[in-house]
Every structure is written in structure tokens, then in C-alpha cells.
């Protein structure tokens, strides 16, 4: 048993490990978010001062991004589905795949350690100096967080190399790149983004580490450094990172929508590929829209404003192609279809607030208010998470060979839908009214919307626990699937359910008609 899981070189077993790790980390991250909302449910302090509050906020962000969304989307779905969809026997480097996973538990341990030693890293996930320098954060907390990020980064880079190699080298003989499934494309582009952006983050946090411990002054004006340099380096990673979090979701939603619509491929398949490539490319040239308030030139701000708005074009292509895929079908409101429809609608709402924030003049006012929080939680908490949930209920029969209870799944979907919207929609109003981020207390005038927001988070918690209960119910009742009802253009369903330890004993042949 230990050998099977500790030394595994099988992409399915490693994918399952990623799922279990991601679900566990997701529960930790959810607990932290509940602490935040409990603190903000009423004016006045509940947990303590702003230091402990910001430590919770920082840990919540890091855990949700690096230990929940990325392991589940790229590690879980990516490992499980990419080889199956390509007809490959496994990933290109199976042992490196195992190492990618086993770097994550030590990494999350370092992160949790960082928040329980000294005063914790109360810097926000951006870790800006001088707040993160040894003047403001004297203990070892920030150093531990930096090491944690290094490990998570190494894990992601190795995984990215693995996926890129697999996708380039392990396709069937006649399969051209434009014939690859959209999910494989999305993971490939995501891997490329990881490979190009993470080394920049590694450089930035290494310089921060030496600033803190070796008396260098990369980010210290007293020695000729500049904290703005850190911001540029961080956001050059940080902006592609948010596209890394959503792109695999795009791929999953494309598959779910085309399959649930009974269509053999998504509308505008090639356009979808080019749209994802455009999003990936543009994601690298818009980073300074996170820094409109640091005093850049007017022409610089004009460029970053317009470049950011251009990203709305390929994103719109994807939204309308999904709607066109749905067009003309009798929509069957299955659980995975509900998640996909919720994704398309709420991701669009999140994208619209993003276009508003792209205006540098408006952003000067809205920067660091709850409007920004509402924006990125709409695209993450209702984009990435809805895609994860939709993908999970869609491919769960493939992964386990069992069925989930569809009636309970629908109840769970609507509970979660109400919960997340009730949590994050009022935050737009709070932001427009000027409530700043990263504070544990607020003036009484913001009380009512905060109470509603906190209420929504409690509903989301109930929905999350209901989901765990549904999975548990499925695992103990073992309703085994006899045969899949899937279309023949989705080759991952050609397997036994669940697939054999080695899925392809001979290479598939692609026939062109």
C-alpha cells in the first residue's frame, strides 16, 4: 500500500493524490475564509489585531491558489485526463510527476509553519516590501513563506515541463495539434505560462530573502534599491498566474458543454484554441494594471489600460462560442450542466467588473477596495471553483466507476450558487462606498452589507459540507456504472469505469475521413 502511493509512477494514482491533497487544502482554505468573514460580520474586533487578521488573509490566498485550485485543476484533472484524451500510456516523465506531487505537502507545511511562528506573515499574498522586509516583519515567518513558495514553484515548473513534453511527443501518429481536445490545449497553454512566469517569481522572492537575511538592498531605497521593482517582478508572475488558474477551467467547461449539448465538438473549436493562446500571450503584457497607483507615466497607464481591455476580446469569443455550442439543443439540466451554465454567467459578471477596473483613472479610486476583492472572487470563487465542481461531478464516474446522487447534487449546486453570490455581490457596493481591503475593522456605515456577505459565506460552508456528504454517500453506496452514455468523440470514456491501471496497451489510431 505504501509503495503504491508513495512511489507511484501511474498518472491516475498521482492524479488521485492531487485530488485528495487539493480537497484537504480546500477545506483548510475555506476554514480560513470563514474566519475572515466571522471577523468582518460585525464592526469591532473579534479575533485580534490586524496582524493576525492579515496572516489569516495571506494564508487563505496562498492555500486556495497554490494548494487547492492548481493541484486540483492541473495536478488532478490534468494528470487524469491529458494522457487518456491523448491516448498516451502515461505522462512523459512518470517519476518526475510523482516528485511534483510530493513537493507539495512539505510546501504547505512550511506555509502553515510561517503563520504559527513569531507573528505570522501578515503581508497579503503579494508580500510587498517594505512591509515584508525585516524591519516590519522581523521574525522567520516571511522566510518560511518564501521557502514554501519556492517548493510550490519547483513543483509547478516540473509539472509544466512534464505536460508540455507529453503533449508535444505523446500524441497519436496522425493527430495534428488542432485535433487535440480543448482540455489538452488548455493544460498545455497553462503549462507554458507556468514555465515562463514562475522563474520570475522565484527571482523576486529570492531577492526579498537576501534583502531580509544577507543585508542586500534590492528593494531598499537606502542602498539604491526600489520596492517598485519587486512589484513589477511579482506582478509579471502574478498576472499570468490568474490566467493559469482559469485556463484549465475553460478547457473543462468546453468539454462539459459540448458533451451535455450532444454535440461532437465545441462551436468554433479552432477559434477557441486561438482565443486561449491570445489570452495566454496577452496575460504577460498587462501586469502593471495592478500598479496604477504607484505613480506611472500617463502614457504607460494608457497602454496598460488598453492592453488589459483587449483581453476581453478573446474571452468574449470563448463565452459566445460556449453559448453557440448550447444553441439549438434541448438543455438537460444535469448537475454538470448547471455548473457550466453558472460558470458562463458568473465568469462573465466577473469579467465585466474586470473591464471596469482596467480603466486606470477609475482604478485609482477602486484600488485596494472591496470592489477588487469582489472582482477576483467572482472569477475565482465562481469561475475556477465552479469549473472544478462541474468537472468533478462530470468525470467522477470515470475516475471511480460510481455515480453521485443527482438530486442531492442539484440541491448542493443551488445552495452554493446562492451562498457565493450572497457573499461577493454586496462587496461591489462596499468597494464603491470606499471600504478598503485587508483591514479587520470598518466604520459602522458598512455594517449591513458586511452582515449579508458573512451570511452568504455561512451558506457556502453548508454547501461545501453537503458536497463532501454527497461524495461520502456515493463511496459507501457504490452504485456501479455498467456502461457510459457518452459520445464517441470523447475518447477518455472508452476506458473501463474506472480505467485499468494501464489504460492503453496499444496505441490508438486516428483515422481521417
Swiss-Prot record:
It comes from the Eukaryota. Its main location: mitochondrion. The chain crosses the membrane at residues 16-36, 62-82, 101-121, 144-164, 182-202, 233-253, 267-287, 304-324, 337-357, 379-399, 413-433, 451-471. One of its GO terms (biological process) is electron transport coupled proton transport. Cu cation binds at residues 239, 289-290. There is a cross-link at residues 239-243 (1'-histidyl-3'-tyrosine (His-Tyr)). Its cofactor is heme; Cu cation. It is a multi-pass membrane protein. Mg(2+) binds at residues 367-368. GO terms for molecular function: cytochrome-c oxidase activity; heme binding; metal ion binding. InterPro entries: Cyt_c_oxase-like_su1_dom (IPR023616), Cyt_c_oxase-like_su1_sf (IPR036927), Cyt_C_Oxase_1 (IPR000883), Cyt_c_Oxase_su1_BS (IPR023615), Cyt_c_oxase_su1_dom (IPR033944). Fe(II)-heme a binds at residues 60, 377. PROSITE patterns: COX1, COX1_CUB. One of its GO terms (cellular component) is respiratory chain complex IV. Keywords: Calcium, Copper, Electron transport, Heme, Iron, Magnesium, Membrane, Metal-binding, Mitochondrion, Mitochondrion inner membrane, Respiratory chain, Translocase, Transmembrane, Transmembrane helix, Transport. O2 binds at residue 243. It is found in: Mitochondrion inner membrane. It catalyses: 4 Fe(II)-[cytochrome c] + O2 + 8 H(+)(in) = 4 Fe(III)-[cytochrome c] + 2 H2O + 4 H(+)(out). Binds 2 heme A groups non-covalently per subunit. Binds a copper B center. Pathway: Energy metabolism; oxidative phosphorylation. Pfam families: COX1. Ca(2+) binds at residues 39, 44. Component of the cytochrome c oxidase, the last enzyme in the mitochondrial electron transport chain which drives oxidative phosphorylation. The respiratory chain contains 3 multisubunit complexes succinate dehydrogenase (complex II, CII), ubiquinol-cytochrome c oxidoreductase (cytochrome b-c1 complex, complex III, CIII) and cytochrome c oxidase (complex IV, CIV), that cooperate to transfer electrons derived from NADH and succinate to molecular oxygen, creating an electrochemical gradient over the inner membrane that drives transmembrane transport and the ATP synthase. Component of the cytochrome c oxidase (complex IV, CIV), a multisubunit enzyme composed of a catalytic core of 3 subunits and several supernumerary subunits. The complex exists as a monomer or a dimer and forms supercomplexes (SCs) in the inner mitochondrial membrane with ubiquinol-cytochrome c oxidoreductase (cytochrome b-c1 complex, complex III, CIII). Belongs to the heme-copper respiratory oxidase family. This is Cytochrome c oxidase subunit 1. The lineage of its organism: Eukaryota, Metazoa, Ecdysozoa, Arthropoda, Hexapoda.
Amino acid at each position: 500500500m505504501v509503495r503504491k502511493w508513495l512511489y507511484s509512477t501511474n498518472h491516475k494514482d498521482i492524479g488521485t493524490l492531487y485530488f485528495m491533497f487539493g480537497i484537504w487544502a480546500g477545506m483548510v482554505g475555506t476554514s480560513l475564509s470563514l474566519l475572515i468573514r466571522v471577523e468582518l460580520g460585525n464592526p469591532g474586533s473579534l479575533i485580534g489585531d490586524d496582524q493576525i487578521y492579515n496572516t489569516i488573509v495571506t494564508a487563505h490566498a496562498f492555500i486556495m491558489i497554490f494548494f487547492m485550485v492548481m493541484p486540483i485543476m492541473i495536478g488532478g484533472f490534468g494528470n487524469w485526463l491529458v494522457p487518456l484524451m491523448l491516448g498516451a500510456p502515461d505522462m512523459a516523465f512518470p517519476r518526475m510527476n510523482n516528485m511534483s506531487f510530493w513537493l507539495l505537502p512539505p510546501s504547505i507545511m512550511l506555509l502553515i509553519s510561517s503563520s504559527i511562528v513569531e507573528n505570522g506573515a501578515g503581508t497579503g499574498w503579494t508580500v510587498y516590501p517594505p512591509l515584508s522586509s525585516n524591519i516590519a516583519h522581523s521574525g522567520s515567518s516571511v522566510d518560511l513563506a518564501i521557502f514554501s513558495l519556492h517548493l510550490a514553484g519547483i513543483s509547478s515548473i516540473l509539472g509544466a515541463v512534464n505536460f508540455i513534453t507529453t503533449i508535444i511527443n505523446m500524441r497519436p501518429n496522425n493527430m495534428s495539434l488542432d485535433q487535440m481536445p480543448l482540455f489538452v490545449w488548455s493544460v498545455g497553454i497553462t503549462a507554458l505560462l507556468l514555465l515562463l512566469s514562475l522563474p520570475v517569481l522565484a527571482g523576486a522572492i529570492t531577492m526579498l530573502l537576501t534583502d531580509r537575511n544577507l543585508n542586500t538592498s534590492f528593494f531598499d531605497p537606502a542602498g539604491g534599491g526600489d520596492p517598485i521593482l519587486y512589484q513589477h517582478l511579482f506582478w509579471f508572475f502574478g498576472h499570468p498566474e490568474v490566467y493559469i488558474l482559469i485556463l484549465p477551467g475553460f478547457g473543462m467547461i468546453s468539454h462539459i458543454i459540448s458533451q451535455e449539448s450532444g454535440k461532437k465538438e465545441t462551436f468554433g473549436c479552432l477559434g477557441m484554441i486561438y482565443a486561449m493562446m491570445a489570452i495566454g500571450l496577452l496575460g504577460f503584457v498587462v501586469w502593471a494594471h495592478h500598479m496604477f497607483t504607484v505613480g506611472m507615466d500617463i502614457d504607460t497607464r494608457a497602454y496598460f489600460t488598453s492592453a488589459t481591455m483587449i483581453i476581453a476580446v478573446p474571452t468574449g469569443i470563448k463565452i459566445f462560442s460556449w453559448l453557440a455550442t448550447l444553441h439549438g439543443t434541448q438543455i438537460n439540466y444535469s448537475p454538470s450542466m448547471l455548473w457550466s451554465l453558472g460558470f458562463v454567467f458568473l465568469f462573465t459578471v466577473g469579467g465585466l467588473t474586470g473591464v471596469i477596473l482596467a480603466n486606470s483613472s477609475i482604478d485609482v479610486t477602486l484600488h485596494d477596495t472591496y470592489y477588487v476583492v469582489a472582482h477576483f472572487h467572482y472569477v475565482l470563487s465562481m469561475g475556477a471553483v465552479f469549473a472544478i465542481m462541474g468537472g468533478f461531478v462530470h468525470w467522477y464516474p470515470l475516475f471511480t466507476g460510481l455515480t453521485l446522487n443527482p438530486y442531492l447534487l442539484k440541491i448542493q449546486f443551488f445552495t452554493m450558487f446562492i451562498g457565493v453570490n450572497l457573499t461577493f455581490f454586496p462587496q461591489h457596493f462596499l468597494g464603491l462606498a470606499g471600504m478598503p481591503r485587508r483591514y479587520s475593522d470598518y466604520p459602522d456605515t458598512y455594517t449591513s452589507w458586511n452582515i449579508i456577505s458573512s451570511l452568504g459565506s455561512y451558506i457556502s460552508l453548508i454547501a461545501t459540507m453537503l458536497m463532501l456528504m454527497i461524495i461520502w454517500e456515493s463511496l459507501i453506496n457504490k452504485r456501479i456504472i455498467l456502461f457510459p452514455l457518452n459520445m464517441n468523440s470523447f475518447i477518455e470514456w472508452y476506458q473501463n469505469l474506472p480505467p485499468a491501471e494501464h489504460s492503453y496497451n496499444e496505441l490508438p489510431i486516428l483515422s481521417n475521413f
